[in-house]
Amino acid sequence: MPVDFNGYWKMLSNENFEEYLRALDVNVALRKIANLLKPDKEIVQDGDHMIIRTLSTFRNYIMDFQVGKEFEEDLTGIDDRKCMTTVSWDGDKLQCVQKGEKEGRGWTQWIEGDELHLEMRAEGVTCKQVFKKVH
């Protein structure tokens, strides 16, 4: 049985986010705005089907996918690229590989207690975010 990621999560910390955005070639103005945001995550999980909504006052991003199946991800509003994305289970963690223009792009997501941990990677840069479950 996979881990239950269902819930609404509020951001607690966001380490190295601006450097991560720089690695994605996000322009300086958007990096500064994005770095000030404290987005929430809303995750709806039905077995291996997941919808992850990243919600902020500036912009929302919705990722709808089936674990284990490659799909084209449109990152308009983030770095305006498209990539071929696969999310897989690695024990109790979700591992995402995003194949495209940027080397080593992807993320890992897992739960510790009532916290959601997310590590995002691109071009050798890692950003670490932590969220607390509120419901």
From Swiss-Prot:
GO terms for biological process: fatty acid transport; lipid homeostasis; lipid storage; maintenance of location in cell; regulation of granulocyte differentiation; response to benzoic acid; response to retinoic acid; response to vitamin A. Keywords: Cytoplasm, Lipid droplet, Retinol-binding, Transport, Vitamin A. Its main location: cytoplasm. The keyword Transferase does not apply. Disulfide bonds: none annotated. PROSITE patterns: FABP (PS00214). All-trans-retinol binds at residues 41, 63, 109. Coiled coil: none annotated. GO terms for molecular function: all-trans-retinol binding; fatty acid binding; retinal binding; retinol binding. The keyword Protease does not apply. Residues 22-32 are annotated as: Important for interaction with STRA6. Belongs to the calycin superfamily. Fatty-acid binding protein (FABP) family. This is Retinol-binding protein 1. It comes from Rattus norvegicus (Rat). The gene is Rbp1.
